[in-house]
Amino acid sequence: MTIREDQKEKRKQEILFASLNLFVQKGYSGTTIKDIAGAVGMSVGLLFHYFASKEELYLALVTLGMEGPMSSVQPTPLEPMAFFETTAERILSYIKSEPFVAKMFVLMQQAFYSDDVPAGVKTLLSDFDVYTPTAEMIQLGQLNGTIRQGDPLALSIAYWGAISGVAETLSMNAQLPCPQSDWIADIL
């Protein structure tokens, strides 16, 4: 990567981080391109060299937000309970060390439930499902006796809901202590 390409990529990351903060604080409709440009100290025109529209920028953030959880639910050689322990540990570690990750959980919740996000985002999110693949892993763990009995889908929702709740809380106050990952895994 050339120096110029490296600088452009760093600037793009600054834009993504600043826009994430603004979208989390003000919502999609409440955030303007002017707000984002001001937060990164550039003109609106220059911002359009990186992202053609607010919708494109928001879509880029939501796409990033989908990549983490979806990569977590890919087939794994780990025993099911080890998968859930490792996943919780990894996510909580990221949440503690990178405020971007905690805020991304908040953005994704907003994107799912808000009526004012672009239709393209809603379409993209319609295929987003971490619950079903993890429910299947839970069922395997139940069969081998490492995961408690109960509705696998409900247990999956409890697991991801706990992680999301921790992320949301720490995004608002990073000074609070982060729960231990095994507490999350113990839900299962």
Segments (PLM) and residue ranges:
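Short coil/turn segments at alpha/beta junctions that flank glycine-rich nucleotide-binding fingerprints
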Residues: 25-29, 98, 144
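C-terminal peripheral helix-coil segments that are non-catalytic and often amphipathic
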Residues: 2, 82-94, 131-144, 161-188
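N-terminal intrinsically disordered/low-complexity leader segments
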Residues: 1-10
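Helix-turn-helix
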Residues: 10, 14, 18, 22-56, ...
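Hydrophobic alpha-helical connector segments
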Residues: 60, 73-101, 155-159, 181
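Amphipathic alpha-helical packing segments from all-alpha helical-bundle domains
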Residues: 70, 74-75, 82, 117-144, ...
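Short, basic, alpha-helical segments at the C-terminal edge of helix-turn-helix-like DNA-binding modules
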Residues: 63-69
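Amphipathic alpha-helical segments used for helix-helix packing
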Residues: 96-121, 171-172
